[in-house]
Amino acid sequence: MDKTKKRRIQILAASVFWLGVWQAAAAAIGQEVFLVSPVQAIGTLVELLPQAEFWQRIGFSAGRILLGFGLGVLSSAILAVAAEKWEWVDALLAPVMQLVKATPVASFIILALVWVSGSSLSVLISFLMVLPVLYSAVRTGIGSADRQLLEMAQVFRLPLGRRLRAVWLPAVLPAFQQGCSVALGICWKSGVAAEVIGLPDGSIGDALYRAKITLSTGELFAWTFVIILLSAVFEKLFLALLDKAVAAVLGEEGAEK
């Protein structure tokens, strides 16, 4: 049995074990308002699936959270390159990035409500949470570039496009990929947290809050499943697309052929 298959079996067995613990705990408590069983939670999710409102909420939240992520990706790359090129930019951004990393998400959400509407809150919060993670990742990648290759590129006066492909991208992309894996999870958690506090109509966060105040524990767990699933699916899709982009940019596909 290969390692990958063995690992999948281990993960499946662990998942079954913890679902069994959850089921046993729900049966022992015997109060659905405190803890529903996994069967009940999945049943509630199945009831939500045919509803148009369910999919509208997913589209509303996913669109805004992913917009924040995209803005974070673009901004972090530009700022990281600028910080590596100019010391004054590095000095200017260092305290800002440290402040964003150190400040609790809830504090940002409450402060941001003063400046933006509830419907735009998840965009801003997702952006802020992603920015320092990817900024650090890109800086790390730039710092790991082979200096000898850079000197050779300068001596032979390679054009910028060739330098990017031969030196900078091979150094930056692995760190960027790892940073994206972390940032995607953070942006989903922080984005939904922003919606729970900002309560924009038609969002997943609004649905979570309504389930909480009506003591609909099954619906609360169902929406939590949805958030976890969305985060995992978008992470897998984005990283798969990024892998293909990396292969295309670095010429790996051509080499394999």
Describe the function of each predicted region.
Residues G179-L229:
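Non-cytoplasmic
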Residues E87, Q178, A222-K257:
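C-terminal transmembrane helix and the adjacent membrane-cytosol boundary/short C-terminal tail
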Residues A137-F176, L208:
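Short cytoplasmic-facing helical segments at TM-TM junctions of multi-pass membrane proteins
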Residues L124, L128, G161-A193, A222:
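Transmembrane alpha-helices
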Residues Q98-V133, T140:
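Generic hydrophobic transmembrane alpha-helix motif, especially the helices
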Residues K5-I29:
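N-terminal signal-anchor transmembrane alpha helix
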Residues L67-M97:
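Transmembrane-helix boundary motif in ABC transporter permease subunits
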Residues D2, A28-G70:
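Periplasmic/extracellular loop-to-transmembrane helix junction in inner-membrane transport proteins
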